[in-house]
C-alpha cells in the first residue's frame, strides 16, 4: 500500500463501517422457516410513519430480541450478525400532548406499532415498552417515516433477475456487499421492497423465485434493506 493509497483506503473502510452500523440490527422477518431478515433502520422507518397518527411523537425507537435464548435456529444461514428468528421487543421513547390522557396516547401508540409491525412488515413482536420523555402543549405534527437510503444494484445473474422480477421488489441493493452473495449451496439476496407490499410476503416470494430459477435449487436467504415508495 502506497502512502497515497493509505488515506483513501482508510476513508473507504471507515465509510463501510459507518454504513453497516447505520443499518442497525438485522431483524428476523416471520419465523425460522421464512429465511428472511430486515434491517432495523428500514423497519424503524415504517414504524415511525405508522406511529404518526397516534398523537405521539416517537423520539427514539429500538427493536431487539425479546429473549434470544428461546429463539429457534433458522432453516437457512442468515446474514452475518443477524438476530435469530424469534419474538421481538420494541422500545420507544415518545412525547405526547397534555390535551389527551397519557394512557390513551400510549395505548394508541402501542396499537399502531404492533399493527404496522405485523401487517406492513411481518415482524413477530411480543412486547412494546414505552417511555414518555416530554409533555407538549400542542398535538405533535404528523411525522413521515424517513426512507432508508441504500445503494441500488442491477441484476447480474439469474438469481438477481428472478428476485428483481418479483412483485413488490423496488430494486436490488448492496448494503452488505453484492446484491446476490453466493456460498456453498446457498444464496443471500439483498433488496428494497415497496411500501404497499408486506415485506415478509415479498421476501417469501423472492426466496421461491430465486430457488426455482437457479440450477441445483440452492437455499436462499433474503435481507430487506429498505421499504420505500415507487417513484
Indicate residue ranges for each PLM-predicted region.
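Terminal low-complexity, intrinsically disordered regions
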Residues: 1-131, 136-143, 148-231
